[in-house]
A protein has these predicted regions:
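Non-cysteine beta-strand/loop elements that form the S-adenosyl-L-methionine
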Residues: 9-14, 71, 105-111, 209-227, ...
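A short, acidic, amphipathic alpha-helical segment used as a generic capping/interface helix at domain edges
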Residues: 247-262
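A short, acidic, flexible beta-alpha connecting loop/helix-capping segment that sits on the rim
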Residues: 270-281, 285
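Active-site acidic/histidine proton-transfer and metal-coordination neighborhood
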Residues: 84-188
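Short, flexible, mixed-charge acidic loops at enzyme active sites
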Residues: 25-29, 113-123, 224-236
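N-terminal pre-domain/capping segments
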Residues: 1-105, 136, 143-144, 151, ...
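Acidic/histidine-rich catalytic cores of soluble enzymes
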Residues: 46, 140-250
Length: 295
């Protein structure tokens, strides 16, 4: 239980209904079901998913019909490989959509410097890493990009530390945030922290003032351990159920609950768990998570 006050805005990711990468998971689930069930489970917002319209004039009335706000949406960035100018051009349609729908943060996931073609289908041990020099240069580009994103779109960059990406481990996240400017906000993902082998509380202590978005994800420790021991891929881990919603796994959310209550955190809390909807019926699963957050 998190004992989270009702003043906090709680959203849910559409990944519980339809996976963005593993297209067979939730392929036949219509967007209408996702949004109606999200609203029925008492969520105030949602993040973007692959079945969402990408034109504000189309998406806005759909969300309004369900009483949902757009909390944010993932941008697949490549600043580890390309220039700030190239990233500016690539992000424009996405940033314009978020801005038009009133979002205040943009989720940034680094997709550069990954194994080509099928980066989430290779053994986790084959993940590519940045050298110290490359990390420093990357941090500089990320800071410039974040500054521009805020100036031109009023969006705070929420950097998503993530398995199989260049900021997966605690050392990598710390190295990056020690070298980026304050314009670069942190998306704290409790599940990705646990799956990467570190305690999310370290990020609360070191970078709490820079946390602008939170993903509430839990981990099934036994499944995660098996995935690591067998050196399986990220996607195979998802299929086997390494992630789940808060309250169903091994993550202790007590410190996070205290953080959002006591620090003035004003961002969204987003329930996010990549699962097979046939094994984890979405409405039942996210409703249980919503009760866990409120209890």
């Amino acid at each position: 239980m998190m004992h989270t006050p009702s003043r906090f805005r709680v959203a849910v990711s559409p990944l519980s209904w339809t996976n963005d990468v593993l297209e067979d998971l939730g392929q036949d689930t219509p967007l209408e079901q996702c949004l109606s069930e999200a609203a029925a489970a008492d969520f105030a917002g949602t993040e973007l998913g692959r079945k969402f319209a990408r034109k504000a004039r189309v998406l806005k009335p759909i969300l309004e019909r369900h009483g949902l706000q757009l909390a944010s949406g993932w941008h697949s960035g490549f600043l580890a490989e390309r220039s700030v100018e190239a990233e500016m051009q690539a992000v424009a349609p996405h940033a314009e959509l978020l801005q038009a729908l009133g979002a205040k943060v943009m989720v940034y996931g680094e997709c550069g410097v990954m194994v080509p073609e099928v980066p989430l289908d290779v053994p986790m041990s084959t993940r590519l890493r940045l050298t110290a020099a490359d990390m420093a240069a990357y941090a500089g580009r990320l800071t410039r990009f974040a500054r521009w994103l805020d100036k031109h779109y009023g969006l705070r960059l929420a950097y998503h530390h993530h398995l199989m990406m260049v900021a997966e481990t605690l050392d990598e996240v710390c190295a990056l945030f020690d070298q980026t400017g304050p314009e670069v906000g942190l998306l704290l993902d409790t599940g990705h922290a646990a799956a990467a082998g570190f305690d999310y509380r370290v990020l609360l202590e070191r970078f709490g003032a820079r946390i602008v978005h939170i993903h509430l994800k839990d981990v099934r420790a036994e499944v995660m351990r098996s995935v690591r021991e067998q050196d399986l891929s990220f996607n195979e881990g998802v299929r086997r159920g390494m992630f789940t919603v808060p309250g169903d796994g091994s993550v202790d959310f007590g410190a996070l609950a205290a953080f959002v209550r006591d620090t003035g955190y004003a961002g969204w809390l987003v329930v996010e768990a990549e699962q097979d909807p046939l094994k984890a019926p979405p409405l039942e699963t996210v409703s249980r998570a919503r009760r866990f957050i409120a209890a």
